[in-house]
């Protein structure tokens, strides 16, 4: 546990240089809940010029920290988000990060802790009642790093009716569909007591599968159509999390589900690559919130498509309409 807290500190330090001169507001509150033990320390960021009475609600970005981290991680993340806003990568947004320990943001099998329920019920309710943020799916976004990448991906995959998009960075997931197939490479950093405290003792393999993003995507891909999905991992990840990320990417690709995937050359699990990668993730959110209207229908694109469609006709290949929610597979 102490070692993982040290790694979380490294992540925070990597983001700290941007934290100086924060123009928005960052506060810490405690949210009471019966779903988890005690109250939850939570960091909330509002952007420069935040107007609680603005006619248009602000997008809400839920951020989930990594294992060993806490809401203190928001210090650096808020500054990097503010940089993304100032660069025009993403609209001015409100963001929130709860402290969740090493819970995996899971509803525990034995019912003693319900972190997923806390996020979907208590956290969302707190933000929507107390801040001028989106109260519907559109404009409600979720992201996270490492354990938070796993949590954000799982929660969004299980509840695509709640979230417009998810940006999962180096998610702590394994490249398997069944628990019994997990290899030592993908679990050396998770001890059995931790897994059993969350998934049951012994681990309830069906419960694990029901909460595994890869299995969810494989078994029910149609539920993900229309969900903005962004996946990121460094190819030098010390926890080998790029293998699990690539696995989910391949499932989504083979199922024809539109998504964006980045395997970042030379990037590690922690360190200076996190800032530019987080900015890329926020740029993805920006494109989801304000889709470019000419990427598929600009005049030059239409002209080129007309020519290519003629090639298809001559070859007897079917011509299907463009659907940005799906990969062009046929």
Model-derived regions: residue spans:
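Bacterial N-terminal signal peptides that target proteins for export
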Residues: 1-8
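Bacterial N-terminal signal peptides
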Residues: 8-16
């Amino acid at each position: 546990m102490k070692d993982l807290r040290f790694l979380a500190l490294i992540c925070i330090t990597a983001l700290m240089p941007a934290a100086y001169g924060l123009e928005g507001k960052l506060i810490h509150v405690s949210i009471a809940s019966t779903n988890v033990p005690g109250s939850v320390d939570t960091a909330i960021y509002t952007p420069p010029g935040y107007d609680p009475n603005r006619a248009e609600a602000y997008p809400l970005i839920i951020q989930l920290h990594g294992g060993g981290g806490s809401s203190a991680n928001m210090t650096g993340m808020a500054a990097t988000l503010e940089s993304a806003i100032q660069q025009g990568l993403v609209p001015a947004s409100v963001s929130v990060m709860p402290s969740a320990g090493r819970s995996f943001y899971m509803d525990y099998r034995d019912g003693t802790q319900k972190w997923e329920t806390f996020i979907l019920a208590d956290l969302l309710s707190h933000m929507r009642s107390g801040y001028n943020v989106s109260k519907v799916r559109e404009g409600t976004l979720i992201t996270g790093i490492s354990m938070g990448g796993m949590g954000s991906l799982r929660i969004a995959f299980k509840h695509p009716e709640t979230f417009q998009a998810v940006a999962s960075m180096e998610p702590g997931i394994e490249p398997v569909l069944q628990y019994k197939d997990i290899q030592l490479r993908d679990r050396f950093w998770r001890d059995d007591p931790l897994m059993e405290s969350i998934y049951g003792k012994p681990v309830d393999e069906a419960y694990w599968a029901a909460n595994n993003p890869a299995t969810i995507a494989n078994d029910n891909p149609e539920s993900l159509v229309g969900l903005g999905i962004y996946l990121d991992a460094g190819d030098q990840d010390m926890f080998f999390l790029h293998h699990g990320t690539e696995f989910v990417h391949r499932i989504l690709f083979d199922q024809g589900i539109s998504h964006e995937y980045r395997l970042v050359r030379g990037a590690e699990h922690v360190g200076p690559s996190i800032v530019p990668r987080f900015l890329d993730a926020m740029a993805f959110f920006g494109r989801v919130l304000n889709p470019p209207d000419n990427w598929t229908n600009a005049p030059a694109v239409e002209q080129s498509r007309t020519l290519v469609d003629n090639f298809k006709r001559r070859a007897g290949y079917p011509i299907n309409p463009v659907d940005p929610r799906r990969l062009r597979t046929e």
